[in-house]
């Protein structure tokens, strides 16, 4: 029997904020995780066909800010640069709109949801694994299932959308062991 083809869709902003919150009470959680190792872990013995990493670049105003702001900007740029170098990961950037203290992400959810449905329509995978707590993906999941695809959800405790969880075939809670620090970020 052929192995199922798996596509992993990572909403990094959602993941990062959850990991950051967990890290406040348990320093062993890593925010700058390796998305490819996460995807491989989630795919298991199945064939990992696609790893999509959806994110936004850090705001440029951080460069002119405090030393801590500059450090955060540089860490994020280095982190995304390392991810972009991995040919097994597709990185897609959304936009930040608004001013300092009132920034909003735009187009991350849209890109991820569109890719999930379009790739299902093209029969590029058998199983989609969504890594997010965001209920905005419910419509994308429902439309993906119209193409007879299975949907798995990796969610974070405490803030997972019940609406999203209810339409997924399999739900798993994120575990510390799923997130390994990205190599090359020593000193950060």
Tell where the protein language model's regions lie, with residue ranges:
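Domain-level signal for Mg2+-assisted phosphodiester chemistry and nucleotide/NA-binding surfaces
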Residues: 1-104, 150
